[in-house]
Structure formats: structure tokens, C-alpha cells
Amino acid sequence: MVVPYGSSDPMHWWKAVHDGTEYGFGTMTNSLTLGCDCLGEIYYLDAHKLAFDGSVETIENAICIHEEDFGVQWKHNDSTQMGYNEVRRSRRLVVSSFATIGNYDYGIFWYLYLDGTIQLEIKLTGVVGISAFHEDIHKPGQDFKISPELASPIHQHLFNVRIDWDLDDGDNQLFETNVEP
């Protein structure tokens, strides 16, 4: 993951931070709190990481696994048969964690659906990076004026994820097709 900045501010113009590789999502993972970070019937996993001295450190409750309702998956109401109404609820398994890197908290959510679909959602939260606003330095289109005295730089969070699909054996392939009119 890389975070390039598009600001003219001397505090930010030089930045192109590699949050995921320079700091590491794994090493910056938070312990999750019951009832706040995950809801429902929850199973937590601890994570283990190497410390700078080579010892092993444990992050308790680093990964949350739970199941949640995801609406109607299938429904049929047959008007030719009185009272025939079938509904199947959709469920998804959620595997999630949070990592704090600098002023950002990244929530990483993997969703596993009953139809085999796998979805990744990354939620960004935290504290806005700011600098003192000055009309000669901060330009529209490069910085946001968030108050009369403060500016925040325009930047992006670009993620790239690789999944190793060696399920059952190494001969499996995955194809994605995008159809446009």
C-alpha cells in the first residue's frame, strides 16, 4: 500500500508513504475490544510477531471472526400454491483486524459468502493530517482548507492484494471478466 501526496505544502509535498510495507499491517495490528470492534458470536485469534530483539510478541485478540446476516439470498412465492413461500437468508463470515499506522487506523475486513464470493473491504479512520493554512502555500486542488487556520493535503491510499489460490493443488486458475455495454 502506498499513500502519495499531491500537496504544495512543504510539510507534505515530498510524501509517498508505504504504510503497508515500511511499517507493516501485521506489526501495527491492534488488540480488538469485545462489543466495540466485533459484534455477535465472536471468535478471536491472537497474532504473533517478531520483536526487534528477535523474541516473539503476542497481540491478543488481533483477529476477529464472526458470522453476520446479509439479507435475503433467495426467495420464491408461488401464487398457484396457497401459502407456498420460501426464503433463504444470506450469511457471511467476517474475518477482520485493525492496524494503526501514524494518524490512520486501517480496518481490514474479509467477507466470505455462501455462494463462494470473497470480498475485501478496507476502512480508513483515524485523525486528519493537518498543517497551518497559508494562502501563498496551499493551493485549491492540492489542499483542503478545513478551517480558517488549518489545511489538509490531498492524498490517496492505493492498495494491492495478492491471494494465493493453491486450493487442493497448484493447477487452479482464477479469471475475472468485466463486461461493459
For every predicted segment, state its role.
Residues 1-181:
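Beta-strand/loop-rich accessory regions of lumenal/periplasmic or secreted enzymes
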